[in-house]
Amino acid sequence: MTTLTRQDLNFGQVVADVLSEFLEVAVHLILYVREVYPVGIFQKRKKYNVPVQMSCHPELNQYIQDTLHCVKPLLEKNDVEKVVVVILDKEHRPVEKFVFEITQPPLLSINSDSLLSHVEQLLRAFILKISVCDAVLDHNPPGCTFTVLVHTREAATRNMEKIQVIKDFPWILADEQDVHMHDPRLIPLKTMTSDILKMQLYVEERAHKNS
């Protein structure tokens, strides 16, 4: 067993790569399972050795890729606390939030040979849980859209400004009123703990979605 800092072997980049790929798959799957877009724009693929649904709509795919491309440098620096997929009704009020809480330890005690395969097994369990989450959630009203929120540590603000210039992709400070839900129902979906990453996924669901 070897103890490394996050700077050794550029391990922050490895974690960011793994998380970015996972979050891309997760966002596509959430949009499919929660029927935010017609099922016809999705195709079955295989990720983490399980079948998943991925969008084949170019503009939607580009938005998701651009978003996560800008999140990746923040993940690399361990500046991300949460990534939230918010599903909004026609009035742009949130009806559901899929919250990925992410914690990366400053010291990594790892066996590098088995590291990635172990993490991928844990991420597979998240994907399987998302695939069946509609069983514990109420139906959403028609005409929903979505957005992605990133909760960062305070020190990340300057990094985000730099990323905006480099990536030409505008981050906008979220208005708490726009994304707030009064007394939502909390549904825990999955938690993982590994040597390089701790992550928790839960859903906040609005009590009366059609009102």
UniProtKB/Swiss-Prot annotation:
Residues 21-155 are annotated as: Mediates interaction with REV1 and REV3L and homodimerization. Residues 13-203 form the HORMA domain. The keyword Cytoplasm applies. One of its GO terms (cellular component) is anaphase-promoting complex. Signal peptide: none annotated. The gene is Mad2l2. InterPro entries: HORMA_dom, HORMA_dom_sf, Mad2-like. This is Mitotic spindle assembly checkpoint protein MAD2B. Keywords: Cell cycle, Cell division, Chromosome, Cytoplasm, Cytoskeleton, DNA damage, DNA repair, Mitosis, Nucleus, Transcription, Transcription regulation. One of its GO terms (molecular function) is JUN kinase binding. It is found in: Nucleus; Cytoplasm, Cytoskeleton, Spindle; Cytoplasm; Chromosome. Homooligomer. Heterodimer with REV3L. This dimer forms the minimal DNA polymerase zeta complex (Pol-zeta2), with REV3L bearing DNA polymerase catalytic activity, although its activity is very low in this context. Component of the tetrameric Pol-zeta complex (Pol-zeta4), which consists of REV3L, MAD2L2, POLD2 and POLD3; Pol-zeta4 is the fully active form of DNA polymerase zeta. Component of the shieldin complex, consisting of SHLD1, SHLD2, SHLD3 and MAD2L2/REV7.
